[in-house]
Swiss-Prot record:
Compositionally biased region (Basic and acidic residues): 864-877, 1019-1036
Name of the protein described by the UniProt record: Transcription factor Zelda
Tissue and organ distribution: Detected in the germline cells of the ovary, in unfertilized eggs and throughout early development. Later, it becomes mostly restricted to the nervous system and specific head regions. Also expressed in imaginal wing disks in third instar larvae.
Gene that produces this protein: zld
Cystine connections: none
Miscellaneous field: 'Vielfaeltig' means 'versatile' or 'manifold' in German.
Polar residues composition bias: residue spans: 60-72, 673-682, 768-781, 921-932, 1276-1286, 1309-1322
Reported phenotype of the disruption mutant: Embryonic lethality: embryos are defective in cellular blastoderm formation and fail to activate genes essential for cellularization, sex determination and pattern formation. Cells display nucleosome occupancy at dorsal (dl)-bound regions.
GO molecular function, one term: DNA-binding transcription activator activity, RNA polymerase II-specific
Ranges annotated as biased composition (Low complexity): 13-24, 73-123, 226-267, 610-634, 683-709, 719-753, 796-813, 849-858, 879-916, 1037-1062, 1252-1275
Length: 1596
């Protein structure tokens, strides 16, 4: 309960809330008691309503937060009167408690409640009232979930109120909540995991115990030691309609959770419940989805509208959730009809939401989300969050129950986190708070502290920018409820992040206990603010308009733009130029626009107030989400900035300082103003606390879930800020993913939400995630971020044991950690967070190490981190101390990562452990913003890895190589972003050790974590093997891999849900493990997966820590730059499975339901044939000419599944394969084109030959053609004979090689030796099939191939397309384009030339008037041979694939029609084709009768495959030469000799046929099936034509 307090607004707000709460007593009489203990947060929410008036008491009455919610926040929907009254009851005591807590004693929740009750009405911002209302609910929820969860929810509620009312208020509330959170951390004894059992559906006015909801609340209550907890839960029930429904159109409005939380196991709260226990129904179309992520995906894909508009604002769902007559948190209408306030879908959502609300209420209870309270906060944040809403929409599935109505930040805090955490979630502070609560055992207190940072929150909140910062804060705030969630939720910009965070929060609050009540978070994600409510409208100036997401980021100014044009225009502004000068970083304008385009950035994330604060907040929130633990969440975006490139990553300057503060101080540092570069200790504390809570609450799962969800959001946000994303993603994602795994196990929905909710978030973070890979920020950013999310779960895991071991201590530690985390978040958000969970000291170390970002430190830290994890149990206690230290050190502002890192390193043993993570994180950050973050660079290996981090999928691929045995799990870990694998790995170890602890979930991951720590520390390798085995066991038990998959893939969420995620224990197990590993990140074996996510960790680093991880990382390293993602459309269960099984954490589900499959380039390479060309096409200088990873998902899946069982080693191997644009496969696709082109050219030069051959075949044509052919053939006859001899070889080669480049022309007889990708043209010139360039000598071709088709040529001339390896050469080359005066000028015209030969050729061709090169077909003359060559291509042009096909079909038809002639050439065997070809060449020289000619082709054809086709061709030619001309390409050519026009057409046809024959023949050789076609084509062509075809094939 105490934890809730932090979230509570001031007493006056609390009072208002209390009255509201009383009104909402629907929560139950117990609610009153719970309010006292766990209703601190709830207090504000209920109090706010009460303060506004008793009127809100009506079930629908929104906690209008009286005057407070005045900003543009609609009144927050109040829970039912019963709930409100209950809340009031709870809140009043809570207010007292809050006061006490504020005094430093007593239940923070009570204090908050008192504050709210007494001050809510007076609070300047309705936010507090809203918060109060939500606080009351939170109280109820807390009761249900225990003080912890309820506290979180309350906080979140209070937070929501603040949020809705105004940024300032929101921040204040957050601060309050933070304060309360701290208290809650210590006070709350209940795990959210336990307490998360109950979830209040927004529409259901009763608690749904998806998690064992009420019983969970009871357990939470017991743990919290306060009956009020139960009350809180009840209240939450009444209020539950609040967030879930409203929060995300997709989540709440878009889907109804049928089966709701109640159907779920306690392990999976609302979100999980939705995914595990209930089917979610799309409110818009009624479609039922398995989990929220699916729903989100569906909503995003089908009901896309605007993320915000579509679902209205989270607050709107909120209102709906308050359902009875919930007003949107609009300031004014306390009793406004929910429908009235709902935007767009809100009304629809209201009713659906009512049902949803019931389910979500349960979720809410689970998530500890006060529905009523959330709406108001949502409103204030809504506009900002609206953008995030989109991603949130998808994510809402996970957090749908509680988060739906809330803004993403709120939802995260509320839905994802625990009541308190949720409250915080809306802002950075609440977010962490939720995590603290999530840490559950000790989390509540921390959350309270975060809220205790109420003033801070307010302070930040008032500022718009700060509001955004709060977004970041929510990142931190999300810590409580899956810090991430809160973190993301905090800031509208971060909504996606919030969504991610939301799940985390939910996971923290409900995930651990009930799979983290994911429902909360997803809503955030989907449209955290989409809930149609005034808040949505008020908060967002265009709440209902679908606006273009701001995907273009100016890293120097942290500004986001909707189009590249706007960005370019911005580059010309003085503001930008000054920023660049002051930053000392290279001007981003010099980079390709693609480097600044982060499509993954969800509209939600980036749109809301992206300007500065919003963007920063969003980034922070997203980062926090990514961190999956408030700490990481907040810093991730800011941390990178803090590191060095802070400016770049942050959405906005506030993001930077505030971002750091947000990230770091989001929870405890909500107060820390997101503006401030350094996160406040509180934030970090909260983050840590949140992490801790998650773990304590079994939130390993919840956190993972919530975080995972948030992470996606974060990713989206991160996308906006690469650094942010990278850091966030790297660690955050790791954590988040791991958490997601846990959470997914509990709440697959949650996971889904994360991925789905924030497709872009997913994608977006990818690039930032790979600091290194800034080159391909958008793609990598997109893909990898998600995986990185996994790391948070490990953190959670570590934390969980600690929590289990010492709830109170853990709480304290969590609190410190939260702050530390937040700070870390700034600098090493993910690492800190991750480490936080493994142990506080770990967090600190990580944070510091991250700051240090020294390779040595990283490796050392990794190893130590492993040890730390070993010592996790011991360290947990230490961790608390360390955490505190860390907080202090982190206070250094992880923003200034280096310093913080050093500080963190203070903890010798833990820091070492953490250090690696931190470093890793730093590296991530550094890599992400390598240009801006020097500190990260200290991890050069990581620097290389960052891209990997970006492409952690690749990492996953890589991972297999070193750890065949572990590879299975390890690889999974790697590939699943170390989500599942990490979780799996750690889980395996931890389960035995930690099963008894806290909760099964927590225990599992704790056990995994501790054992992992111990084992890793003691014997990383053995541990890894053990983990691997255990992971497998766990995988089997928990289907961790599946969970990982789910985590990795939002779509997979359902899978996750069905698999272990569904069950609390399995999720916890895998999640925590992942989390721990993630934090250690790669240092541990599990980390490798994370490393996949968090590429930044250098393989060496990983290796030192865990041999297997290093493997992963090692391979990853080379690949990271090549990492890319493949978009998979459709549900991701299979994909997820592939990921989990395949060990590819590359699949990321985007908010729009797309599943991005990240594939290492090397993986891609093996499948190069699939899209080598596309790779080449896609390659861009910025991507370093690495092959896109868009290679078939199939390949990836194959890799994944193969890799999963140590098959990943092969995958790694594949990865290792260097990308070569000229891969034969690449040629494969172009083969036809090349063949055709080659054939055309061949025809051009060889046409005469063909004509002659045809002419020979066709008497008329034969004579004319023979003359020409004789001339040509006699010249080339020797060559031809050679070719004939060689052609079989060439042909064989063709068969063996997809792109053999035998010469098509007879002259090519020697072409065979040219190169596999070249062909000799009839003219004797050698043509490069890769780029169609021609050369007179082989040496030129060789030189050309070396220069253009091998190795990496990153410098590409935009004018002529030439590529250069070195910048010097490239610069020199560019000079030539610029040079106006070229040395050689034409005396007859103004033209100038660089080379004398060019001038001479020009004069001869243009000015002499001599046209000595004549076209044999049309008799046109050309002054230059190359002109003639080009012209000849026009004759062959019609011979395109299509024409070829038509010609082939015609030939086939003719063949069928004329079967009589089939016997003509039946004698020759298949081998005779080549002979025929040779013969045809001979025939060409010696005019052969049509019959003879036909016989030859027919024989080969017959021998090869289709006698009929042969006969047809033979028949056509033999029977009717003139008919043949039409049917047979060859004959056309011959005819052409006679009739130019007809020849042209025929020639074209012949070319087509020939090309088809070439291809067919090639295929024939490869597959006999194609023999028929080849035969047909060959038949159609006379022997001579066959020769041509043969040559063509050779070319192929």
């Amino acid at each position: 309960m105490t934890s809730i307090k932090t979230e509570m607004p001031p007493l006056h707000a609390a009072e208002a809330l209390a009255s509201s709460s009383a009104t909402d007593s629907g929560g139950g009489g117990a609610g009153g008691g719970g309010g006292g203990g766990g209703g601190g947060s709830g207090g504000p929410g209920a109090g706010g309503t009460g303060g506004v008036g008793s009127a809100p008491a009506t079930p629908n009455a929104t906690i209008s937060a009286a005057a407070d919610s005045s900003d543009n926040q609609p009144g927050t929907p109040q829970p039912t009167q019963q709930q409100q009254s209950t809340q009031q009851q709870l809140q009043q005591p809570q207010s007292q408690q809050q006061q006490q807590q504020a005094m430093g004693g007593g239940d923070p929740q009570q204090q908050q409640q008192q504050q709210q009750v007494t001050g809510i009405t007076h609070q300047p911002y309705a936010t507090h009232h809203m918060y109060s209302a939500s606080g009351g609910q939170q109280q109820q929820q807390q009761q249900i979930y225990g003080g912890l969860y309820g506290g979180d929810m309350q906080q979140q509620q209070g937070y929501a109120s603040s949020y809705i009312n105004s940024y300032e208020q929101f921040y204040q509330q957050q601060q309050q909540q933070q304060q309360g959170t701290d208290y809650a951390f210590g006070t709350v004894g209940v795990d959210y995991g336990k307490s998360a059992g109950v979830r209040y559906h927004p529409y259901l006015q009763t608690p749904t115990s998806g998690l064992g909801g009420i019983p969970t609340a009871s357990s939470a209550q017991e743990e919290a030691g306060s009956a009020p907890s139960a009350v809180s839960t009840t209240t939450a029930v009444a209020m539950s309609p609040r967030v879930v429904s409203s929060s995300s159109p997709t989540s709440t409005s878009s889907h109804l959770q049928l089966g709701s939380s109640s159907g779920q196991t306690p392990g999976s709260p609302g979100g999980a419940a939705g995914s595990a226990g209930c089917k979610l129904q799309c409110k818009k179309c009624g479609i039922l989805t398995t989990n929220e992520s699916e729903l989100q995906e569906h909503i995003a894909n089908v009901h896309g509208e605007s993320p915000y508009g579509s679902s209205g604002y989270a607050s709107s769902p909120y209102i709906k959730e308050e359902m009875p007559t919930p007003q949107p948190p609009g300031v004014g209408s306390a009793t406004a009809n929910p429908g009235e306030l709902l935007d767009l879908d809100s009304q629809k959502m209201v009713y659906h939401q009512q049902l949803l609300q019931q389910q979500q209420q349960q979720h809410d209870v689970v998530a500890g989300l006060p529905l009523g309270a959330l709406p108001d906060p949502l409103h204030s944040m809504q506009s900002m969050q609206q953008r995030a809403l989109h991603s949130w929409e998808q994510q809402p599935q996970q957090t749908v129950a509680s988060v739906e109505g809330l803004p993403p930040y709120m939802q995260q805090g509320l839905g994802v986190g625990l009541g308190v955490g949720v409250d915080k979630s809306p802002y950075y502070s609440p977010k962490q708070s939720p995590y603290h609560q999530s840490t559950g055992v000790g989390g509540a207190t921390l959350i309270k502290q975060e809220y205790g940072g109420h003033g801070l929150i307010k302070s930040e909140y008032p500022d718009s920018q700060h509001y955004v910062d709060k977004s970041f804060d929510p990142t931190a705030g999300g810590a409580g409820g899956a810090e991430l969630c809160a973190s993301v939720a905090t800031s509208p910009a971060e909504f996606p992040s919030t969504t991610t965070g939301g799940p985390g929060q939910e996971g923290a609050a409900g995930a651990a206990p009930g799979g983290g009540y994911r429902g909360f978070e997803p809503p955030s994600s989907s449209s955290v603010l989409p809930a149609n409510s005034l808040t949505a409208k008020a908060a967002t100036w265009k709440s209902n308009e679908a606006r273009r997401p701001k995907t273009y980021n100016c890293t120097a100014c942290n500004k986001w733009f909707t189009s590249s044009g706007h960005l370019k225009r911005h580059y010309n502004t003085t503001l930008h130029k000054n920023a660049v000068k002051s930053s000392g970083q290279p001007d981003p304008a010099t980079l390709p626009i693609s480097a600044h385009h982060h499509p993954a950035r969800d509209p939600v994330t980036k749109p809301s107030r992206r300007g500065n604060a919003a963007a920063a907040a969003a980034a922070a929130a997203a980062a926090a989400s990514a961190s999956g633990q408030g700490q990481q969440q907040q810093p991730p975006i800011p941390p990178p900035p803090a590191n060095v490139p802070p400016p770049e990553p942050p959405r906005s300057p506030p993001d930077y300082g505030g971002g750091g503060g947000l990230g770091v101080g989001a929870m405890g540092g909500a107060a820390m103003s997101q503006y401030s570069a350094s996160p406040s200790p509180t934030q970090q504390q909260q983050h840590h606390l949140n992490h801790h809570q998650q773990q304590a609450n079994g939130y390993a799962n919840g956190t993972a879930n919530g975080y995972g969800y948030m992470q996606q959001q974060v990713q989206s946000t991160t996308n906006a800020s690469p650094q942010h994303a990278s850091n966030n993603n790297s660690n955050n994602q790791q954590q988040q993913q791991q958490q997601q795994q846990h959470h997914q196990q509990q709440m697959p929905q949650h996971h889904n939400s994360v991925l789905n909710g924030h497709p872009n978030g997913l994608a977006g973070p990818s690039a930032p995630h790979n600091n290194n890979t800034t080159q391909m920020p958008s793609s990598q950013m997109r893909g990898l971020l998600n995986e990185t999310t996994t790391t948070p779960p490990p953190t959670t895991t570590t934390r969980a044991p600690q929590i289990t071991t010492t709830a109170t201590t853990t709480t304290t530690a969590a609190t410190t950690v939260a702050i530390k985390s937040e700070q870390m978040e700034d600098s090493n958000h993910t690492h800190t967070h991750t480490h936080t969970h493994p142990n506080h000291s770990h967090s600190q170390d990580r944070s510091h190490s991250s700051s240090s970002s020294s390779s040595m430190a990283t490796e050392e830290a990794e190893e130590q981190e492993l040890r730390d994890q070993e010592q996790a149990d011991d360290h947990l206690h230490q961790h608390q101390q360390a955490s505190q230290q860390y907080l202090l050190s982190a206070r250094h502002y992880h923003s200034s990562t280096p310093n913080t890192l050093s500080s963190s390193n203070t903890n010798p043993s833990t820091p070492s452990s953490n250090s690696p993570h931190t470093i890793y994180r730093q590296e991530q950050q550094g890599t992400d913003f390598s240009r801006t973050t020097p500190p990260p660079q200290p991890l050069p290996p990581m620097g290389m890895l960052p891209p990997m981090a970006m492409d952690y999928n690749m990492l996953a691929l890589d991972m297999p190589m070193p750890m065949p045995t572990l590879m299975h799990s390890n690889m999974l870990q790697c590939s699943s972003t170390s989500t599942t694998p990490l979780a799996t790995t750690i889980t395996t170890s931890m389960p035995d050790t930690m099963q008894p602890p806290q909760q099964q979930l927590v225990h599992h991951y704790q056990a995994v974590l501790h054992p992992l720590h111990q084992q890793l520390g003691e014997q990383h390798q053995r541990q890894e093997a053990d983990h691997h085995q255990q992971q497998r066991e766990l995988h089997q038990l928990d289907q961790q891999q599946q969970q990982q998959q789910a985590l990795i893939l939002a779509d997979s969420l359902p899978h996750s849900s069905s698999s272990p995620t569904s069950s609390s224990p399995p999720p916890t197990m895998p999640m925590p493990l992942t989390t721990i590993t993630a934090p250690q990140l790669l240092p541990l074996q599990p980390p490798p997966p994370h490393i996949t996510s968090t590429m930044p960790m250098p393989p060496t680093m990983h290796m030192p820590i865990m041999p297997p991880p290093p493997q992963c990382y090692q391979q990853l390293q080379p690949l990271d730059p090549t990492m890319s993602y493949h978009t998979i459309i459709g549900s991701g269960p299979e994909a997820h499975t592939g990921t989990a099984g395949g060990g590819y954490s590359n699949q990321i589900t985007t908010s729009d339901g797309q599943i991005l499959q990240l594939m290492p380039t090397s993986l891609f390479a093996p499948y190069a044939p699939l899209s080598p060309y596309s790779v080449a096409a896609q390659r861009s200088p910025q991507e370093g000419d690495l092959p896109p990873v868009h290679t078939l998902t199939t390949a990836l899946h194959a890799h994944q599944q193969g890799g999963q069982q140590e098959a990943q080693t092969p995958t790694l191997t594949v990865l290792s394969t260097p990308y070569s644009p000229t891969v034969s496969s690449s040629r494969a696709t172009p083969a036809l084109e090349m063949d055709m082109a080659t054939l055309m050219q061949h025809h051009q030069d060889y046409e005469m030959e063909q004509y002659q051959m045809q002419h020979q075949q066709l008497d008329q044509m034969q004579q004319h053609q023979q003359q020409l052919d004789h001339q040509q053939q006699q010249q080339i006859l020797a060559d031809q004979t050679q070719t004939m001899a060689q052609q079989p070889l060439a042909k064989k080669r063709r068969g063996g090689n997809a792109t053999p480049s035998t010469t098509k022309r007879r002259r090519n007889s020697s072409v065979g030796s040219t190169s596999p990708h070249s062909t000799t043209l009839p003219s004797g010139r050698i043509k490069c099939l890769e780029c169609d360039k021609e050369f007179t000598k082989n040496c030129y071709l060789t030189q050309h191939n070396k220069s253009f088709h091998s190795g990496e040529y990153p410098f590409r001339c935009q004018k002529c397309g030439k590529r250069f390896q070195s910048e010097d050469v490239y610069t020199t080359h560019l000079g030539r384009h610029r040079t106006q005066d070229k040395p050689h000028k034409c005396e007859l015209c103004p033209k100038q030339f660089h080379h004398k030969t060019d001038l001479r050729r020009h004069v001869e061709a243009i000015h002499t008037g001599l046209k000595q090169h004549m076209c044999d077909i049309c008799e046109k003359g050309f002054c230059r041979k190359d002109h003639l060559r080009k012209h000849l291509e026009t004759h062959n042009r019609p011979r395109v694939v299509g024409k070829k096909s038509a010609a082939a079909a015609a030939a086939a038809a003719a063949a069928a029609a004329v079967t009589a002639t089939a016997g003509l050439g039946g004698a020759p065997a298949a081998g005779s084709i080549k002979a025929a070809f040779a013969r045809s060449l001979t025939v060409t020289a010696v005019s052969s009768e049509p019959g003879a000619g036909v016989a030859i082709p027919s024989a080969p054809a017959t021998a090869t495959c289709a006698p009929v086709s042969v006969s047809a061709s033979a028949l056509v030619q033999a029977v009717n030469p003139s008919l043949t001309s039409g049917l047979s390409l060859k004959r056309h050519i011959d005819d052409v000799a006679v009739d130019d026009d007809s020849l042209l057409e025929e020639d074209e046809d012949e070319m087509e046929m020939e090309m088809e024959m070439d291809m067919l023949e090639e295929e024939d050789e490869e597959e006999e099936e194609l023999g028929d076609h080849h035969m047909i084509i060959k038949s159609e062509y006379v022997q001579e034509e066959f020769q041509m075809i043969e040559k063509s094939i050779e070319l192929y």
